[in-house]
Curated annotation (Swiss-Prot):
Protein's name according to its UniProt entry: Cysteine-rich venom protein 25
Organism listed in the record: Naja haje haje (Egyptian cobra)
Keyword annotations from UniProtKB, A to Z: Disulfide bond, Secreted, Toxin
Endpoints of the signal sequence: none
Region entry Disordered, spans: 1-25
Length: 25
């Protein structure tokens, strides 16, 4: 469960970074 939550958090963080990158272009 903890591993799943960690994976989910990492995925959301990565997605946010991608969105931020796109917005900066």
């Amino acid at each position: 469960n903890v591993d799943f939550n960690s994976e989910s958090t990492r995925r959301k963080k990565k997605q946010k970074e991608i969105v931020d990158l796109x917005n900066s272009l």
